[in-house]
């Protein structure tokens, strides 16, 4: 089936978070993002979302660099020759090094359009089978431990299946001890966002007593070797996030023993197809995966739900309810969590309608790129 995309619209959105979100590398009050709309010859739209932040805290990509890459390189490559399947795009984009979040945003829009043309949910087009997915919640660094415990209590009461607490030097062992004392039976993990070095091994070993599901990305964002040295010293499984940008990164990490769990983020690895390949590799190796979050708006959240329906996404992901982050999301219905579960939509494509009124409300500027004139 040919995918005949006539034009692409890039929209720069700015959305206000309901509450500040703090990690080891910064505090976020607003989220900028690029919404990608790919429209075919029959007027059917597919939607994708860039998950890059406004500054290069998480990776070298930013909203501005993503816009540049999409405008100058990726959209022209999309239009450069006929396309029959979204899985062709990674090879087409391979000449562009890195810039995975920009690639994923455009590829995601094409996948959504492709599934809609087939008349099937995106999850089915990807090979997913689950009808509902388990979800956890990610909680940023709070002003005080008392504040953190109060936030956790609220989300435990809402039924979230796993609590993730951000940590950094000075906000780690004692904090996790207080959390575990208050919530002895809650599935709990810690996320360091690369805040430590191998010299901190003894401090990280001190987390073993709390029965954590995992510690996420304790060491440098580009490291595999020191994680492989650290993992045998810990009872707690290491989960890699920032270090895994591709199938080959995942293969090397598993070969080295750098981790026991992998967090798959669609944007970080360059799109849905690469995410699926990493999922399949981990399934073959007996390594569980889960879907991480990047403060996505509704379109990105919908893509996360779709990929999580693959069988080896065996651990609760970060795809919390829309209301966890936004007063009003850009999709309808919004993503809702009931008893720690999200019911997977069965409508074609991402399964949610994009609320164009809300999109217009949040849009700062936009640009249209036609097949016949990509500038």
Curated annotation (Swiss-Prot):
Keyword Transmembrane found: no
Organism: Geobacillus kaustophilus (strain HTA426)
UniProt xrefs under CDD domains: NAAAR
Keywords: Isomerase, Lyase, Magnesium, Menaquinone biosynthesis, Metal-binding
Cofactors demanded by this protein: a divalent metal cation
Family stated for the protein in its record: Belongs to the mandelate racemase/muconate lactonizing enzyme family. MenC type 2 subfamily.
GO annotation (BP), single: menaquinone biosynthetic process
Name of the protein described by the UniProt record: o-succinylbenzoate synthase
Active-site residues (renumbered): 166, 265
Molecular function terms, GO-annotated: isomerase activity; magnesium ion binding; O-succinylbenzoate synthase activity
Function (record text): Converts 2-succinyl-6-hydroxy-2,4-cyclohexadiene-1-carboxylate (SHCHC) to 2-succinylbenzoate (OSB). Also acts as a N-succinylamino acid racemase (NSAR) that catalyzes the racemization of various N-succinylamino acids, including N-succinyl-L-valine, N-succinyl-L-alanine, N-succinyl-L-methionine, N-succinyl-L-tyrosine, N-succinyl-L-serine, N-succinyl-L-isoleucine, N-succinyl-L-phenylalanine and N-succinyl-L-leucine.
EC number assigned by the record: 4.2.1.113, 5.1.1.-
Associated pathway: Quinol/quinone metabolism; 1,4-dihydroxy-2-naphthoate biosynthesis; 1,4-dihydroxy-2-naphthoate from chorismate: step 4/7; Quinol/quinone metabolism; menaquinone biosynthesis
Superkingdom of source: Bacteria
SUPFAM superfamilies: Enolase C-terminal domain-like, Enolase N-terminal domain-like
Catalytic activity: (1R,6R)-6-hydroxy-2-succinyl-cyclohexa-2,4-diene-1-carboxylate = 2-succinylbenzoate + H2O
Binding positions for Mg(2+) per the UniProt entry: 191, 216, 241
């Amino acid at each position: 089936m040919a995918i005949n995309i006539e034009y692409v619209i890039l929209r720069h959105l700015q959305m206000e978070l309901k509450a500040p979100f703090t990690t080891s590398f910064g505090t976020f009050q607003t989220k900028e993002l690029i919404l990608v709309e790919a429209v075919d010859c029959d007027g059917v739209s597919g939607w994708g979302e860039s998950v890059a932040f406004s500054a290069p805290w998480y990776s070298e990509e930013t909203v501005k660099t993503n816009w540049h890459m999409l405008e100058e390189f990726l959209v022209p490559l999309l239009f450069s020759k006929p396309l029959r399947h979204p899985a062709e795009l990674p090879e087409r984009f391979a000449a562009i090094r890195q810039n995975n979040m920009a690639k994923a945003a455009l590829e995601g829009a094409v996948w959504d359009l492709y599934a809609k043309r087939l008349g099937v949910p995106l999850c089915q087009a990807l090979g997913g089978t689950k009808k509902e997915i388990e979800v956890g919640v990610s909680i940023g660094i709070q002003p005080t431990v008392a504040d953190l415990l109060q936030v956790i209590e609220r989300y435990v009461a809402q039924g979230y299946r796993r609590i993730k607490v951000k940590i950094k030097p000075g906000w780690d062992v004692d904090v996790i001890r207080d959390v575990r004392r208050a919530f002895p039976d809650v599935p709990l993990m810690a996320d360091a966002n690369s805040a430590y070095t191998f010299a901190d091994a003894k401090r990280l070993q001190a987390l073993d007593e709390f029965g954590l599901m995992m510690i996420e990305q304790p060491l440098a964002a580009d490291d595999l070797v020191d994680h492989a040295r650290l993992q045998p010293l810990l009872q707690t499984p290491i989960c890699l996030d920032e270090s895994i940008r591709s199938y080959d990164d995942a293969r090397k990490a598993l070969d080295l023993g750098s981790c026991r769990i992998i967090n798959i983020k669609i944007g970080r690895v360059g799109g849905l197809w690469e995410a699926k390949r990493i999922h399949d590799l981990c399934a073959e190796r007996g390594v569980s995966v889960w879907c991480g979050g990047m403060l996505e708006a509704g379109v990105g959240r919908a893509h996360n739900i779709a990929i999580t329906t693959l069988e080896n996404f065996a651990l609760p992901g970060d795809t919390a309810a829309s209301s966890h982050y936004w007063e009003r999301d850009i999709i309808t219905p919004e993503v809702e969590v009931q008893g720690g579960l999200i019911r997977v939509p069965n409508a074609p494509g991402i399964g949610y309608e994009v609320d164009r009124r809300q999109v217009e409300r949040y849009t700062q500027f936009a640009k249209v790129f036609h097949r016949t004139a990509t500038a």
